[in-house]
């Protein structure tokens, strides 16, 4: 389980790939990949930082190699290239151990290319380690911020729960009691008779036909509104009424046909013009009595 968790964590580390391999490296890897795995001695132990933190023996390494190769072949190519580079280095070490001094000269180009790829792979995974550290710090900071927010919300919720509940209950009690009091204060209306025959017989259920009218509450009469006249009103007497009648008889309403500043003339037809009609009171001319 630890091996799979470590590989799944490494699968997220992705950066530009390492340089391409030479033809000689490809031929060596294709021909000697299987042979070198079986030709290793039982006493030697191999340290593989790509997938293990401790040295492993050949008995347990065969299973891990097959599992890890199948895993990396379907995932990120950077892991696959790193694993292939590891196999190439192991093959090259084995060939140098078994060979003579001439092998160093013959395999000079291969050694240089492997060293170059090793440097690229080292820089690649060093960058990935730095990125993982930064990601871990950012995730830890985010977790701390979320925990602080949760604690703050819980503190605000549990700050004064008792006082809030008592105040809310005290406010709700009168609101719940008011409609009940109103219902009890209203007079109960008797049921109306179902037919005219029941009315003639004395009412339905022993109730007189006009008893429900007496129990209906009467609405208050609308209050009389004061007049809009600003002048103080006087109680009219008999002499005042006679004087007002004489004044009304001596005055008449006459329309003023002079042009007015508020008049609007839109056409020659006076019926369509929108204007303000001005009237004034004039004294009536005394009619000449016929002799």
UniProtKB/Swiss-Prot annotation:
Cellular compartment(s): Cytoplasm; Nucleus
Record key words, sorted: Cytoplasm, Nucleus, Phosphoprotein
Phosphoserine modified-residue sites: 267
Region (Disordered): 1-62, 220-242, 255-291
Any GO CC annotation of this UniProt entry: cytoplasm
Compositionally biased residues, Basic and acidic residues: 18-41
Biased composition range(s): Polar residues: 42-58, 226-236
Additional comment: Present with 450 molecules/cell in log phase SD medium.
Protein's UniProt name: Uncharacterized protein YDL129W
């Amino acid at each position: 389980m630890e091996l799979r968790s470590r590989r799944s964590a490494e699968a997220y580390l992705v950066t530009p790939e390492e340089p391409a391999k030479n033809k000689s490296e490809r031929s060596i890897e294709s021909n000697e990949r299987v042979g070198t795995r079986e030709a290793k001695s039982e006493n030697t132990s191999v340290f593989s930082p790509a997938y293990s933190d401790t040295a492993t023996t050949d008995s347990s390494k065969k299973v891990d190699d097959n599992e890890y190769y199948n895993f990396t072949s379907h995932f990120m190519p950077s892991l696959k290239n790193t694993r292939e580079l590891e196999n190439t280095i192991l093959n090259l070490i084995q060939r140098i151990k078994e060979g003579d001094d001439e092998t160093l000269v013959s395999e000079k180009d291969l050694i240089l290319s492997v060293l170059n790829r090793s440097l690229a792979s080292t820089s690649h995974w060093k960058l990935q380690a730095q990125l993982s550290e930064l990601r871990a710090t950012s995730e830890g900071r985010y977790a701390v911020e979320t925990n602080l927010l949760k604690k703050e919300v819980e503190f605000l919720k549990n700050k004064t729960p008792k006082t809030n509940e008592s105040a809310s209950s005290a406010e709700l009690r009168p609101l719940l009691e008011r409609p009940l009091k109103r219902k009890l204060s209203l007079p109960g209306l008797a049921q109306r008779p179902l037919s005219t025959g029941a009315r003639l017989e004395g009412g339905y259920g022993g109730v007189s036909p006009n008893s429900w009218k007496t129990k209906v509450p009467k609405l208050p009469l609308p209050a009389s509104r004061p007049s809009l006249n600003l002048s103080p009103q006087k109680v009219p007497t008999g002499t005042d009424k006679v004087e007002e009648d004489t004044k009304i008889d001596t005055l008449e309403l006459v329309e003023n046909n002079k042009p007015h500043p508020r008049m609007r003339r839109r056409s020659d037809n006076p019926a369509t013009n929108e204007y303000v009609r001005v009237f004034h009171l004039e004294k009536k001319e005394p009619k000449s009595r016929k002799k």
